[in-house]
Amino acid sequence: MSKAIVTGGAGFIGSNLVDRILPLYKEVIVIDNESSDANEQFYWNDKCTNHKLDICDYENIRPLFENVEVVFHLAAEARIQPTIKNPILSAKTNVVGTCTILQCAREANVKRVIYSSTSSGYGLKNKIPLNEEMPDDCLNPYSVTKVTGEKLCKMYTDLFGLETVAFRYFNVYGERQPIKGQYAPVIGIFIRQRDSGESMTIVGDGEQRRDFTHVSDVVTANVLASILENKEPVGKVLNIGTGTNHSILEIAKLIGDNYKFIESRLGEAQETLANTDRAKKMLGWVPSVKLEDWLEKNS
């Protein structure tokens, strides 16, 4: 293959993806501005062509798209609570930034853009398990802006012929997961708190349930979606989850026995659980990592 771009390629999911696709492309270009406060470090791969740039910076990122075959768009203002604190920044990065990436790809005749979205777009009103035909129920700036990105992808496919595939990830965890601050993903927070001798902080009563998906399975979905001969997922949204879920209290007990309960937070669903039939059918994708097995080995 020729070239690929990974936005957010020095972060958690992006850096794992970069490591996987390096053998598949003549050149992998990484765009990242190191803006995530939750990342303990950033993972720039020295085998890539690396650019510390903002995805909204059209003038500087546009030349990077020439002769690129596939764009993996992961850069975002991520996680719910930080976007509630700063909705303007989340709108700029997740909407304007995504539109900028799509426009650059369109102008450079990129063959396909693979977009990372979120299961939080399903909100509270939809019944479990969640499937892609259900209506959006966005409860916070994060879900609103990421789902808007999905709509932009669909529009660029329908109006301009740019092939796009959008993924709704369900609570990704694994190697290089963010651990800093109170708004990092919960598994990373719990491991950090336990290792530092603190009590693990469980929001609310801990009975909220989440479908946790290992980062390697997310990476596999991205690689499968980049196979250009497969047109079936183009213009579609696909769930990437496991089809099983665990309560936050269960997760805490798997990691340690020192925990406490803190006040509930606004804008978060009580339960997530993915129906992954579409990803299985269109990509041949199935999750391979069980949360309990990973925690036993890594926590």
Please report, for each region that a protein language model flagged, where it lies by residue.
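Residues that form or immediately flank small-molecule/cofactor binding pockets and catalytic motifs
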Residues: 55, 135, 174, 207, ...
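Residues in well-ordered alpha-helical elements
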Residues: 59-62, 69, 81, 88, ...
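Gly/Ser/Thr-rich beta-alpha loop segments that engage phosphate groups in nucleotides
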Residues: 10-13, 99, 125, 145, ...
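Residue-level signal for the nucleotide or nucleotide-sugar donor/cofactor binding architecture
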Residues: 56, 85, 93-96, 133, ...
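C-terminal substrate-binding subdomain of Rossmann-fold SDR/epimerase-dehydratase oxidoreductases
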Residues: 195-299
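NAD(P)-dependent short-chain dehydrogenase/reductase
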Residues: 127-128, 151-210, 215-224, 245, ...
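N-terminal Rossmann-like NAD(P)+-binding domain of SDR-like oxidoreductases, especially those catalyzing
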Residues: 1-170, 285
